[in-house]
């Protein structure tokens, strides 16, 4: 939720998981409760990722992509390590973009702001899903990015089911592909190399190679 004027707007977090994992700098916090029940962020501009992507002609530059990967990674790491929780998948507008100032060269920050797909990680490193995804309500703008194992479970239409907590890593990889080359599904190996030729052997290239592994246990969220 955003409020305010053109000069300053605010976003209010009410999810304990997202408040505790929030990757935004504390300088942007205008209010934070001691018991992690309320956090308000102040920024020059706040917008959903779909709007930011549209303004950038459906292509994010390398540095912006790197920043987004790092900030989402910080959130996922906090959820996993500090809270023993994970995310099944991401939609495009599960990510919100926060601008520190009105100029184009000011800092841009990214954060997961939808808690709907957060679940406990069990002893087998899995997340249990007990409620259905309402696929009919998904808009073409708010695209979903599902891992192969998640798509398989959705096709079965049976509840409950379980997913490895690294399902989210694959989802982030697909989201990054969409933000860079407007592809919402993983291309085959030869096309992957062609599409990513401008950034081959860079940190983001190797990051995508690691998170887009078919076997969840082989996925690594590393961008160094």
Description of each model-found segment:
Residues 68-69:
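Activation segment signature within eukaryotic-like protein kinase domains
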Residues 23-63:
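Conserved structural core of kinase catalytic domains
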Residues 150-165:
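Conserved end of the kinase activation segment
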Residues 88-149:
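Activation segment/activation loop of eukaryotic-type protein kinase catalytic domains
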Residues 210-224:
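A conserved short helix/loop substructure at the end of the activation segment
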Residues 199-214:
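Conserved C-terminal C-lobe helix
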Residues 73-86:
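Protein kinase catalytic-loop region centered on the HRD/HxD motif
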């Amino acid at each position: 939720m955003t409020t305010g004027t053109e000069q300053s707007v605010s976003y209010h977090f009410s999810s304990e998981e997202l408040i505790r994992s929030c990757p935004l700098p504390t300088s942007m916090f205008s209010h934070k409760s001691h018991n992690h029940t309320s956090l308000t962020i102040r920024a020059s501009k706040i917008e959903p990722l779909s709007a930011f992507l549209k303004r950038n002609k459906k292509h994010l530059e390398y540095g912006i992509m790197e920043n987004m990967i790092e900030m989402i990674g910080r959130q996922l790491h906090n959820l996993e390590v500090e809270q023993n929780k994970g995310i099944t998948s991401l939609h495009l507008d599960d990510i919100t973009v926060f601008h520190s100032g009105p100029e184009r060269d000011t800092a841009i920050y990214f954060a997961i702001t939808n808690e709907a797909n957060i679940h406990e990680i069990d002893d087998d490193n899995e997340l249990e899903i007990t409620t259905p995804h309402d696929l009919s309500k998904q808009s073409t703008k708010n695209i979903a990015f599902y891992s192969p194992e998640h798509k398989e479970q959705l096709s079965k239409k049976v509840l409950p089911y379980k997913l490895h907590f690294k399902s989210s890593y694959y989802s982030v990889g697909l989201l990054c592909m969409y933000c860079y080359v407007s592809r919402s599904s993983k291309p085959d190996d030869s096309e992957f190399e062609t599409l990513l030729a401008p950034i081959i052997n860079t940190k983001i290239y190797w990051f995508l190679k690691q998170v887009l592994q078919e076997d969840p246990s082989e996925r690594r969220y590393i961008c160094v």
